[in-house]
């Protein structure tokens, strides 16, 4: 019975060889290539910070303005509108506003409009979107072509769901 049982009682245990940071231990062979320490003056640092701040301000000022409007009875549309606003803030200068708090005269100035609304009952408008609905229906035409998107929430159990 010549079974190879050398590994029968072999126990594996983890062991790591930690390498020291090479930038701390490296010795340059050529002294000309030896790294010299760069010192940054406080004045130079402030200039760099101010320059980057002006670049960021100009980039943020050029972003397209976006408004997310919501109307809700239960709060679900408000939650989704806030999530949408968070995502839109990565690319746009975005804000979220309830329909009843929205200044309707700003509609012509909007470049991008997202509407998140639910329907209540058989396709009826939520209470805080009623005034926006009336103003929108009384509007004859918009001089500025507003780009918009509507996300409607409702139940298919009603024959006129999302009719608002």
UniProtKB/Swiss-Prot annotation:
Positions of heme b binding: 18
Disulphide-bridged cysteine pairs: none
Main location: cytoplasm
GO biological-process terms attached to the record: nitric oxide biosynthetic process; peptidyl-cysteine S-nitrosylation
Activity modulation notes: Not stimulated by calcium/calmodulin.
Amino-acid positions noted as binding FMN in the UniProt annotation, renumbered to this chain: 72-74, 76-77, 118-119, 155, 162
Enzyme class: oxidoreductase
Pfam families associated with the record: Flavodoxin_1
InterPro entries on file: Flavdoxin-like, Flavodoxin/NO_synth, Flavoprotein-like_sf, NOS, NOS_N_sf
Residue intervals of the Flavodoxin-like domain: 66-164
SUPFAM superfamilies xrefs: Flavoproteins (SSF52218), Nitric oxide (NO) synthase oxygenase domain (SSF56512)
Subcellular location: Cytoplasm, Cytosol
Binding site for (6R)-L-erythro-5,6,7,8-tetrahydrobiopterin: 3
Keywords: Calmodulin-binding, Cytoplasm, FAD, Flavoprotein, FMN, Heme, Iron, Metal-binding, NADP, Oxidoreductase
Annotated catalysed reactions: 2 L-arginine + 3 NADPH + 4 O2 + H(+) = 2 L-citrulline + 2 nitric oxide + 3 NADP(+) + 4 H2O
EC number(s) stated in the UniProt entry for this protein: 1.14.13.39
Coiled coil region boundaries: none
Names of the cofactor(s): heme b; FAD; FMN; (6R)-L-erythro-5,6,7,8-tetrahydrobiopterin
Induction: By lipopolysaccharide (LPS).
MF terms (GO), sorted A to Z: calmodulin binding; FMN binding; metal ion binding; nitric-oxide synthase activity
One GO CC term, this protein: cytosol
Cofactor: binding details: Binds 1 FAD. Binds 1 FMN.
Subunit: Homodimer.
Family membership: Belongs to the NOS family.
PANTHER family given in the database record: NITRIC OXIDE SYNTHASE, NITRIC OXIDE SYNTHASE OXYGENASE
Record protein name field: Nitric oxide synthase, inducible
Record lineage: Eukaryota, Metazoa, Chordata, Craniata, Vertebrata
């Amino acid at each position: 019975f010549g079974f190879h049982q050398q590994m029968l009682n072999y126990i594996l245990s983890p062991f790591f060889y930690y390498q020291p940071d090479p930038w701390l231990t490296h010795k340059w062979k050529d002294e000309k290539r030896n790294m010299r320490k760069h010192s940054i003056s406080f004045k130079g640092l402030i200039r760099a910070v101010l320059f980057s701040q002006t670049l960021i301000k100009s980039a943020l000022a050029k972003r397209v303005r976006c408004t997310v409007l919501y109307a809700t009875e239960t709060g679900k549309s408000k939650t989704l509108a806030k999530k949408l606003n968070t995502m839109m803030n990565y690319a746009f200068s975005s804000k979220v506003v309830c329909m009843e708090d929205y200044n309707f005269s700003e509609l012509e100035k909007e470049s991008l409009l997202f509407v998140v609304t639910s329907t209540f009952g058989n396709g009826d408008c939520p209470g805080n979107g009623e005034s926006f609905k009336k103003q929108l229906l009384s509007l004859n035409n918009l001089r500025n072509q507003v780009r918009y998107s509507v996300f409607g929430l409702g139940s298919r159990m009603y024959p006129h769901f999302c009719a608002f």
